């Protein structure tokens, strides 16, 4: 569909974002986890979702591998496909924020421009960039999926950190040391959410 198609009209919802947030008892927001493969993005995001669920917070976790089984199953790993992957995820995340959810996304999302694109789509105050800062050597030593080994052997092309660039955030809302205990990282994130009045419990 062309963006300029005049036959496609936006319909406003009778229930507002603010009403949905009041119903949930917290604000809608995206926590955008970014970092190298093996940095701990999915692990920390999953642990945070579990902690938030126990607090009664309405959440949803969008994982990089999972969306490629459905929503983005037609995309590869070229720069163009990666950009489209992030665009689609950003649109879904934005819809979930408008539903009043705390959305956690775990994607390498290697380019600053794509992360900024999602930030602008979601809106300031509703986008929290979480940089899981783990050295490449540590990520490669972990190699939970065996992808670094394949990349080093030339069996996997365009792999971020090896033969494809990762642009680290320059001004993320929070930088997490990926070598710390997951429980410590989750606590840092809960503190941030409370400080920003996103959750109250």
UniProtKB/Swiss-Prot annotation:
What's the top EC group for this one? transferase
Which terms under GO biological process does the entry name?
Answer: hydrogen sulfide biosynthetic process; sulfate assimilation
- Phosphoprotein is among the record's keywords: yes
Instruction: Name the positions where ATP binds.
Output: 35-42
Cite the GO molecular-function annotations of the record: adenylylsulfate kinase activity; ATP binding
Keywords recorded for this protein, A-Z? ATP-binding, Kinase, Nucleotide-binding, Phosphoprotein, Transferase
What exactly does this protein do? Catalyzes the synthesis of activated sulfate.
The record's similarity note reads:
Belongs to the APS kinase family.
Listed name of the protein: Adenylyl-sulfate kinase
Gene, per the UniProt record? cysC
């Amino acid at each position: 569909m062309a963006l300029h198609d005049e036959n496609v009209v936006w319909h406003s919802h009778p229930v507002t974002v603010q009403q949905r947030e009041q119903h949930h008892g917290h604000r809608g927001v995206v926590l955008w986890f970014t970092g190298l493969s093996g940095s701990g993005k999915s692990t920390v995001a999953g642990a945070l979702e579990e902690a938030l669920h126990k607090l009664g917070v309405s959440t949803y976790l969008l994982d990089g591998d999972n969306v490629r089984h459905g929503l983005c199953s037609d995309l590869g790993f070229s720069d163009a496909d990666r950009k489209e992957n992030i665009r689609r995820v950003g649109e879904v995340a934005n819809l979930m924020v408008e539903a009043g959810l705390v959305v956690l996304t775990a994607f390498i999302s290697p380019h600053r421009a794509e992360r900024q694109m999602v930030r602008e789509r979601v809106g300031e105050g509703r986008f929290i960039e979480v940089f899981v800062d783990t050295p490449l050597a540590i990520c490669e030593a972990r190699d939970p999926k065996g992808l670094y080994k394949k990349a080093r052997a030339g069996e996997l092309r365009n792999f971020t950190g090896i033969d494809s660039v990762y642009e680290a955030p320059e001004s993320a809302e929070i930088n997490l040391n990926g070598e710390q205990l997951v429980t410590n990282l989750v606590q840092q994130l809960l503190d941030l959410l409370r400080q920003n009045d996103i959750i109250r419990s």
